[in-house]
Amino acid sequence: MSWIEPEVTKKPRRPMFLCVLSNTKTAHIPKLSAAGKTAELTDYTPAGDAELMDTGNIISVPVLPMTPPYDTPTPAIMTRSALKLTDAPYNFINSGLIVTPEVPCIDLKAKPGEDIRKPVAVYDVQGVYERAKFLGKRLRNQVDHVVIGESIPGGTTTAMGVLMALGYNGNVSSSADENPLKLKKQVIEEGLKASGLTFGCLKDDPMKAIACMGDPMMPAVIGLVAGFQSTDVSIVLAGGTQMAAVYALIKHLGFNTEKLAIATTRYVVEDKSANFIELTRILGVPAVYVADPGFGKSELKGLHRYETGTIKEGAGAGGAMYLAGLYGISQDEFRSEVENVCKLLKAGH
C-alpha cells in the first residue's frame, strides 16, 4: 500500500514548491491557535517555519515553533525533509508577516491580517491578489507542476469564517488536541456581525469575504493560481481546511478548477471534529491526495503526538510529502529523514 493515496505515478519534469507565509491578529485570541507555545509567539511561527524549511534550524526567532502541552515539533519538519530528499526548487512568499525570516522571501507588500472581529480583516485584497498573479505569471514558464503551501497561525478560524460567508457550514480542523470549535464559532459570529454579514451573503463576492473574514494568505494563493492558470501547469494546494477554503474562493471567482488538487495529511482527514473530506466533495475538488508519514513507527515521542491529533498539517506538509511520493521516496525513507531533522534540532524527544 502506498503512503500517498491515491498513488501518484507520473513524476513531473519541473516541479516547484511554494510556501505563503502570513500572520493574522486573530491568532492573538487566547486558546484559539496552538501553532506556537503562546498566543504571542504565534507571530514568530511562519518565520521560524521558513528558516527551518530552508536551513534545517531556526535563525532569528526566539523559539522553535512547537505545540503545547507536549512541545510537538512544527509540521515544517516534514516539509524540510521532503525538500531535502527531493531537492525540488522552492520559494517562500511573504504575504503579511509580522516577523520576517532571515531567509530569502518574495515580498508581496501585504499587511498582516487584523482580528476578524474588526470590520476589515485584510487590507488591499485586490492589490495582494494582483501582485501574486504577476508572480505566478513570472514563474509559470519554469514549472509544469506547482505545490502551494501555507504557514499562518489562526488560519483555520479565518478559513471557517470565509466558508460561512460563502455559504458553507462545516467544522474546520485545528492544530490542537482539543479543537476549540465553540470558541472559533463565537469569534466568527462576532466577525460576521462586525462586518454586517450573514451566512452565505458573500457567495457572489469572494474578495469581500476575504476582506471581512479572511487572512492575507488567501489572496496570495488565489493570485498565484490565477497566474499559473493560462498554462498547462498542474497545481496542488497543500493544506487541509485552509486550502479547502481557498479552493472555495477560487470556485466562487469562476476560475477553471480542472487542474487543481488538494494534498493533505492523514491527520486532517481522520480529525473527527472536522469534516474535511465531506467539504471537498461538496466543493467538487477534482482530486484529494492524503499522505501518511507513519509516525506511529517512529522512535521519537514528539512524532507520536501527531498520531494522537496534536498538530495535523501546516507549512505545506501534506503537499511536500505528496511531492516526495512523486519522486519515489518511500515512507520509511521519509520518516527516517524527519527523525534526522528532529535530532539535529533536539526536538520531538
Curated annotation (Swiss-Prot):
<dbReference type="InterPro" id="IPR002805">
    <property type="entry name" value="Nict_dMeBzImd_PRibTrfase_arc"/>
</dbReference>
<dbReference type="InterPro" id="IPR036087">
    <property type="entry name" value="Nict_dMeBzImd_PRibTrfase_sf"/>
</dbReference>
<comment type="similarity">
    <text>Belongs to the UPF0284 family.</text>
</comment>
<dbReference type="InterPro" id="IPR003200">
    <property type="entry name" value="Nict_dMeBzImd_PRibTrfase"/>
</dbReference>
<dbReference type="GO" id="GO:0008939">
    <property type="term" value="F:nicotinate-nucleotide-dimethylbenzimidazole phosphoribosyltransferase activity"/>
</dbReference>
<protein>
    <recommendedName>
        <fullName>UPF0284 protein Mbar_A0178</fullName>
    </recommendedName>
</protein>
